[in-house]
Amino acid sequence: MANIKQTKKRVLTNEIARQRNKAVRSRLRTESRKFHALVEAGDKDAAEKQMRVAARLYDKAVTKGVLHRNNAANKKSRMAAHLNGMK
């Protein structure tokens, strides 16, 4: 454990941020899995709605600094490609 007051505070702050980021990433993975399940099932209308939900969450994660903007753009692009590849 750190001895300096400011480093002790940073340890606590970093832990709070880590837990918050973990929750955001977990929600992203959950919504992304739901989207991919709908694509596999062939339900295009529901998949489109779910993609909008997931894309919005990716944008929010970028705004919060959880993800890099290029990472989110890549994931949204792949989701769009999967959606467009549906019959």
UniProtKB/Swiss-Prot annotation:
Membrane-crossing residue ranges in chain numbering: none
Similarity comment text for this entry: Belongs to the bacterial ribosomal protein bS20 family.
Disulfide bonds: none
Statement: the UniProt record of this protein carries the keyword Acyltransferase: no
Stored Gene3D superfamilies: Ribosomal protein S20 (1.20.58.110)
A single cellular component GO annotation: cytosol
Pfam families: Ribosomal_S20p
Protein name, per record: Small ribosomal subunit protein bS20
Function noted in UniProt: Binds directly to 16S ribosomal RNA.
One GO biological process term: translation
Keywords recorded for this protein, A-Z: Ribonucleoprotein, Ribosomal protein, RNA-binding, rRNA-binding
GO MF terms held by the record: small ribosomal subunit rRNA binding; structural constituent of ribosome
